[in-house]
Amino acid sequence: MYKKIKGTDDIYGEDMKYWYFIENTAREITRLYGYSEIRTPIFEQTELFVRSVGEETDIVQKEMYTFKDKGDRSITLRPEGTAPTIRAFIENSMVATGLPKRLFYIGPMFRYERPQAGRQRQFHQFGIELIGSSSSLADAEAIVVADRFLKSLGLVDYTIKINSIGCEKCRAEYKKKLKEYYSDKLDKVCDDCKRRYNTNILRLLDCKVDVEYVKDAPKITDYLCDNCKKHYEETKNILDKLDINYEEDPLLVRGLDYYNGIVFEIHHGKLGAQSAIGGGGRYDNLIKELGGQQTPSLGFAMGIERLIIAVKKEGIPVEEIKNNEVFVAHLGESARIEAIKISEELRDNGISVVFNTMERGLSAQLKHASRLNCRLCLIVGENELERNVVILRNMKTGEQIEIERDYIVGTTREWIDEQ
């Protein structure tokens, strides 16, 4: 027997209502803010992610699913959604239709990580990209969209953490101070931090092993240039005026190399040590880095599996999927075709119908309808058809009535609306 690959999930049945809930909410919130959906390929050229995410990041070094295709090209299953979106923006000359460009995506991503609750090797993200604005209004909008989305899900136990990691100018001085701070600790830090000390010193602040050194490290907010400091203060001021709750975290740097300026993460209080449910920030240099014109941009992404756990932990009620409103049972050879016609009439009027396609008696058909959680059952029998009637049965209460053939659709709709 074949089994699913480790780190993947089959999503079906009761779980689907959570996926519909989160995806539908994401689409509604992005609609309110003028974002359009984009769907990019699941695999891209490997170099796209090496160039954008950063050669020394854990994602590129350890986590990417990379392979050679039959044309000997290096291909990678996308580990995140921003780089493919920006590649599509450049390749399709979206700048020609005007800026800023607001895009969102929902889809699977792939990283070779140790599977654990809410963290799979194939996982799903909802993300937005706001391309073309350097204003603090854009930074605030991204955070406001994230906050409204989470509130619309009914979540309350979350924290938005924000920081500014500055520009290349102010980061240069900060990196010097950070190197000085860690210079006498290199024999004590983890192997990853030893390597990052010379390749990307900022990534030491993202270490989950040497946390005692991280908390005492110099704060980048003390080294921001005037422009970055002004941008950070303006963004916070807008969030304050909009009553958006957030916490400043001067050690927040994010795990991808393309970020600059404002960065933020969202953590949920009921998810334990792995509490992050999303994050994002500015990436003003990424489009130029990937071959386009210098274009200020920012965005965020959230893990859908993590969001589902958060929704369940907070006990948020999620509406059942109302797929199976009516089960149509039939008895006798001559009743089959009429039962099919009745089913199609109901569907023509927007009523979902499950039609019996098995050789079963009435008792077995009713039992199957109950398993499917059908609300009503229409019983089409030869004897009833001779009298030009069918039987409509409430599957929850057992109440049933006879309906004349011409009134089936109207009466069925009334019974559905009453429930």
From Swiss-Prot:
Keywords: Aminoacyl-tRNA synthetase, ATP-binding, Cytoplasm, Ligase, Nucleotide-binding, Protein biosynthesis. The keyword NAD does not apply. One of its GO terms (molecular function) is histidine-tRNA ligase activity. SUPFAM superfamilies: Class II aaRS ABD-related, Class II aaRS and biotin synthetases. It comes from the Bacteria. It catalyses: tRNA(His) + L-histidine + ATP = L-histidyl-tRNA(His) + AMP + diphosphate + H(+). It holds the Pfam family HGTP_anticodon. It is found in: Cytoplasm. One of its GO terms (cellular component) is cytoplasm. CDD domains: HisRS-like_core (cd00773), HisRS_anticodon (cd00859). GO terms for biological process: histidyl-tRNA aminoacylation. Its EC number is 6.1.1.21. Homodimer. Belongs to the class-II aminoacyl-tRNA synthetase family. This is Histidine--tRNA ligase. It comes from Thermosipho melanesiensis (strain DSM 12029 / CIP 104789 / BI429).
